[in-house]
Amino acid sequence: MPLSFGVHIPTCIEGMMYPIPFARTEDILPTALLCERLGFDSVWGNDHMTTQRYVQREFADPPNYYEPLVTFAYVAARTTRLRVCTCILVLPMRHMVVAAKQAATLDQLSGGRLTLGVGTGAYREEYEALFPDAKGAHRGTLVDEGMRALRRLFTERRVTFLGRYVRFEEVECFPKPVQDPLPLYAGGNHAEVRRRAGELGDGWLPAVLSPEEIRRGAEDVRRAAERAARDGARIDIAPQLVVSIGRTQDEALRRFRGSQLFKHLESLSRTTLREQTGGYEQRNLIGSPEAISERIRAYQAAGVTTLAGMLFVASTVTEMQDAIELFGREVLPNFR
C-alpha cells in the first residue's frame, strides 16, 4: 500500500502547537492550496472549544480556535483532490446526531473526501468546562457509544440508540455520506484506543510514537479486529508526528527544542503521552530531508500507511509554509 501524507493546517493550534497570535482565517486556505499543489494527500485539523489552563498561564491573550468541520467545508469548496480529516473531533463535546448530520453534509459537499478521526480529547478540563454537571462521565465509554451511533446514523433509515451516555430515539438522519463507509478513525495512544480502533474503526490515529511502538500497537489493533471478526489488515495505521526539517540535524533539533510544539508535547505527558517517557526526537521526524526520508521508511516498515496531520515546527505561518514546501519538494518525491 502506498504511503499517504497529510498536513495539519491551522484550526485549533494557537497557544498549544504555535504561539499567540499565529494564524488568521485568511491563512487557512493558502496553506491547504499549497499542500494540494505540492502533492500531499490530505489536510487535517484538531478540535477545541475553550482555552487550556496551561495556555492561559503562558499567554495574556486567548487563542483563536477555528471549528474544524466548518473550516473543512470552506477548504473542500476550494480544493479538488485533498481529503479533509479531523485529528481529532472530540466526541464527548458533541451531540452524536448533530455530529452525524455535520459529517454527512460535509462528505456530500466535498464529494466523499472526509475522514473523521474521533476521540476523548486530551484535556478533561475542557469537557468539564462545557459540562460541569457531568464531571464523573467516562469519556472513553462515551466515545465507544458515539462511534457505534455514528455508524448506524450513517447507514440506517431510522435509528434509536439507548446507551449509557448517547441516547436518542427514532432519528432519521439524511442525506447519508457519499462514502460507504465514511472512514472513522480512533484517536489516541492508550490500549483502550487500540481496542476501539480494532473493534470499531477504519484507522488508528496515535500521536508521537516510535516505529517500534507503532509496530506493537498495530499488532494490538489487528488482534482486537480479529476478536470482533473484522479484517485488521484493512485498518489504516495513521500516526500524527511533529516535523522539524532543516538543512542539518543540529539545526532541525535546535528548532524543535525551542518550539511551542515541544512545550505542547510536554503538556501532553500527563494525558495522551503519559505512557511515553521522553525521547521525543525518536518519536517524530526531525532532521535533514535525507534523515527524515530514512526515518519515514522505518515507520513504513513498522506498518504505517498514513502520516496523518504532520505538525511542522514554526513560529509564523510563513515559516510553517516554507517547511511544508521544503518537505514537499525534497521528501515527498522519495515516496511517489
Predicted regions and their residues:
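Flexible, glycine-rich active-site loops centered on histidine and acidic residues
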Residues: 2-23, 91-160, 208-215, 219, ...
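Hydrophobic faces of well-ordered beta-strands that scaffold small-molecule active sites
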Residues: 5-9, 43-45, 83-86, 114-118, ...
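Active-site mouth loops of central-metabolism enzymes
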Residues: 11-26, 88-97, 177-189, 243-246, ...
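Short, acidic/polar
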Residues: 22-35, 99-102, 186-196, 288-298
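Conserved, mostly hydrophobic/aromatic
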Residues: 35, 39, 47, 75, ...
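Alpha-helix-loop-beta-strand connector modules within alpha/beta enzyme cores
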Residues: 57-84, 142-149, 153, 227, ...
